[in-house]
């Protein structure tokens, strides 16, 4: 197409299996989109607010500058809250249009969001996310060296994916769904709650509270 309206991307794919974007991919894609007249939206619903550890926003890790940023989830720490930030140029385009949100600007939600931002800063949760993430990655890679069923350990901060396969040395096909489900359920007996994701549903998603 000669023109593109919008390029939307997660800096780290969340439900897709905690996959960091390949080095340079987003940057080059954004260049092409901009050249075709499009905008760049960074989806920070999962990566925002310090969860990557090394940076407050996922797009900062990539060295990109989005036109629009979507955010939610940890923004309210359990309280239903989401927001969209945008450049002045994009906002000016919306100004003449009729846009509204029935619950937009809810004062209780705004108070919750403000306190979350304060706690993230006051309790240094971004640094904690980095430290605990490094600890997780070290331990998980030690487990990977012992068990051939762990195909990959990846992520940053408290956004970590553990991909389960049949045998890392012989068969990288996804672990049998029944076996994966059995492990997934048994972890609950140890007080551990994982998410799961990936194209084949064979990735443990480790995204605990940043505190």
Question: Model-found features: residue ranges?
Answer:
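Conserved N-terminal phosphate-binding loop of PLP-dependent enzymes in the Aspartate aminotransferase
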Residues: 1-211
């Amino acid at each position: 197409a000669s023109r593109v309206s919008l390029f939307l991307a997660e800096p780290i794919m969340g439900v897709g299996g905690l996959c960091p974007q390949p080095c340079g991919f987003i940057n080059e894609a954004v260049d092409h989109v901009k050249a075709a007249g499009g905008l760049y939206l960074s989806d920070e619903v999962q990566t925002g607010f310090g969860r990557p550890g090394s940076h407050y926003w996922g797009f900062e890790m990539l060295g990109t500058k989005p036109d629009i940023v979507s955010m939610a989830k940890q923004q309210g720490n359990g309280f239903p809250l989401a927001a969209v930030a945008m450049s002045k140029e994009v906002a000016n385009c919306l100004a003449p249009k009729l846009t509204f949100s029935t619950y937009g600007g809810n004062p209780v939600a705004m108070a919750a969001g403000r306190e979350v931002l304060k706690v993230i800063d006051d309790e240094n949760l971004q640094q904690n996310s980095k430290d605990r993430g490094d600890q997780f990655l070290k331990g998980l890679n030690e487990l990977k060296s012992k068990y051939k069923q762990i195909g990959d350990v990846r992520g940053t901060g408290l956004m970590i994916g553990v991909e389960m396969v049949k045998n890392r040395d012989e068969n990288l096909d996804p672990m049998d769904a029944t076996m994966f489900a059995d492990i997934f359920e048994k972890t609950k007996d140890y007080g551990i709650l994982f998410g799961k994701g990936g194209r084949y549903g064979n990735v443990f998603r480790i995204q605990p509270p940043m505190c």
